[in-house]
């Protein structure tokens, strides 16, 4: 699965400051990651979920779930990296609205082909002529708290979609907190869903 966050540029500093305040309150200074969710930080992760939900449609999450059994590598020149960036394009393209300007920050990835991000930016710009893609850059997740929060939300969605949650665990509690706040289970959504969109892509076509 691939995930992303969407937020107005004007809220970026405010949200980062609020997360910093939560870190101080809970003495939680390590990298925020789904794989690091633990019982002794449960309240911290609960409050991160609450913070995300509190902004409504001004702070959104979207992910694409790909069924590996349907993925035909031959359609991507037998290049898994190329296939990844095609899905990355689909993830971002449907969030770009006319007459807006966008900056895209990606988690740093060791690419065999160094042109992946410039080509992604070019494809997004050509497909959205009435919008401006001013920047597409990679940053190390350990230094970018919003990329870390995206990892947390992606892990929650992935664990529910893939059926890997174990009852009674802190991860299950975090997912339940998110589902309660959204007032629905984490499951594939309609295309129009704004707040927490889970796109289970059908590689044969259709939503």
Language model features with spans:
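Phosphate-ester processing/binding pockets and catalytic centers
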Residues: 1-207
